[in-house]
């Protein structure tokens, strides 16, 4: 699934991804697939999976496009 980063707070390590076909999805820095400092930029296109988290759907396996 693809979407766009709505916002991401690097200090707190989380944010939201705007899906092309649905509701926004929570994203935690631990779901970002990259080495080193894991962060996302507002407006950045990403690809991701959706999994059921403790508080509802959240992004997993997030890859920057």
From Swiss-Prot:
Subunit relationships: Homodimer.
GO biological process, one term: regulation of gene expression
Location within or outside the cell: Cytoplasm
Coiled coil: none
Domain CSD: 3-62
Molecular functions per Gene Ontology: DNA binding; nucleic acid binding
Pfam families: CSD
Keyword Zinc: no
Keywords: Activator, Cytoplasm, DNA-binding, Transcription, Transcription regulation
Protein name: Cold shock-like protein CspC
UniProt-listed InterPro entries: Cold_shock_CspA (IPR012156), Cold_shock_domain (IPR050181), CSD (IPR011129), CSD_CS (IPR019844), CSP_DNA-bd (IPR002059), NA-bd_OB-fold (IPR012340)
PROSITE patterns per UniProt: CSD_1, CSD_2
The keyword Transmembrane helix belongs to this UniProt entry's keyword annotation: no
Organism domain of life: Bacteria
Gene Ontology cellular-component terms listed: cytoplasm
SUPFAM superfamilies in the record: Nucleic acid-binding proteins (SSF50249)
